[in-house]
Amino acid sequence: MTEQFESTSFPSDIPAVNEESKLSAEETFKSLSEILAENSTLPVGISSIRVTGAHHTRPSFIRKVLKTCLDTSKPAKSRSLLETLNAIQETTGNLMAFNVYETANIKIDRASSSVSGDDDLDVTIQVKEKPRLYVETGTDVGNVEGNVHANVLARNVFGGAELLSGNVSYGTRNRSTMSVNFETPVNADPKTRLRFNGHSNLRDNKSISSHDLLTKGITLSLQHQDLWSGEHLLSQNLLWRQVTHLTEYASPSVRLEAGDSLKQSLSYTYTRDTRDHLMIPTKGDYVRQTLELAGFGFLPGDASFLKSEFWGQKAVALNSSRSVSLSLSARIGALHSLNKKQVSLCDRFMLGGSTSLRGFSEDRIGPKDGRDSLGGTAYMAFSMSLLFPLPKVDASKPFRLQLFANAGGLSNLTSPNPCGTYKSILSKPCISTGLGLVYATPAARFELNFTLPIATTEKDIGRKGLQFGAGIDFM
């Protein structure tokens, strides 16, 4: 086997090399590949492994991360060369996943210790730390809203890849938001994280239901990523909500909701995303299932319900170049009161708008009192979108034309026959179709659609004509 293997990062602006240098590099790479292939099953041991450049990381934390390579439960030289290289690569990937290192290079030499075997290795992982303090200001586009924000992030706070962040933002719907978030890996595993979050948010709901909603709360959560690209999130939430700043036109139903409410809940969310592109996928699936149980615990509060919501999307390419794709989406939710009281306006589902049911005004589908939307406890929504390139525009550009059809509805669950609620939604759905232009960026997706409501109920507000949408979670 060779004396040394080394992985090195190079600057992107190096000058072009001549043909002789190219041939030399190709021959070296070919020779190295042949040596690795010939010795892939050779039993090797790791004499020493060390991480350099981690100046602000605790040695005890580094030792836990390196346990993948230094597994003392296995006998010496029980791994082949290929298995050892894969383990080293996996360990380096784990280091990078903590989001505290900028680069990591691997250097492998023959063991220099006099007590080491001929096929033992010395491994050095050279890392470069990211700045410990990061400050950012800018603008964001969320689901049908925009904001300006300032973020502060402190990395490696206690030397164990902890992250402490603070955020302040002001926007069109979320008038003011402040949050503090602390997260730390559990047992030096980047796939399992413990998070603590404290936040305050003032949301403007006047255009929908004649009030503002002030929310303050804390959340403790445990997040784990499994081997099948699934993400599990278990959270304990304690929230104080206030329906406030009612307008003079607020309906009696909204006025009855005015004031304070306290919610303690336990929630579980499973997410699996295999799409090749977040904004304009051409293949893959997206699944999100959320369960929330409110009203139990040391401080039960006045909210008591069981809430379930499912989101799913399937994308398939319709041609070999993947420039034409079909996307099918479905969402369904149910909310059941556990104390025989009406579920608070703060917790009900809302439906309608460019990111859910195109062709209808934002959150204006379902039960109402006068001009105020009251939300509901049961909903279904379906969407089919055909995306294809613009004429004379390169298919690699993030522009697409879109043909779509949406259907769905929002209502309230009836206790004697909850299934009948969904049958009623399916029998009289809100339906729209249309054509539009899609522009995708890494941060958000923008749509400009001409929409045509085909079917609507008496109270639901359809929008014929141009409708603009900006956000992340589109159907």
Curated annotation (Swiss-Prot):
Superkingdom, taxonomy of origin: Eukaryota
Compartments reported by the entry: Mitochondrion outer membrane
Any single GO CC term annotated in Swiss-Prot or TrEMBL for this entry: SAM complex
Swiss-Prot/TrEMBL domain comment: Its C-terminal part seems to contain many membrane-spanning sided beta-sheets, that have the potential to adopt a transmembrane beta-barrel type structure.
Keyword Membrane: yes
GO annotation, biological process: protein insertion into mitochondrial outer membrane
Keyword annotations of the record: Membrane, Mitochondrion, Mitochondrion outer membrane, Transmembrane, Transmembrane beta strand
PROSITE patterns: POTRA
POTRA domain segment(s): 44-130
Tagged with keyword Methyltransferase: no
Protein name stated in the entry: SAM50-like protein SPAC17C9.06
Family: Belongs to the SAM50/omp85 family.
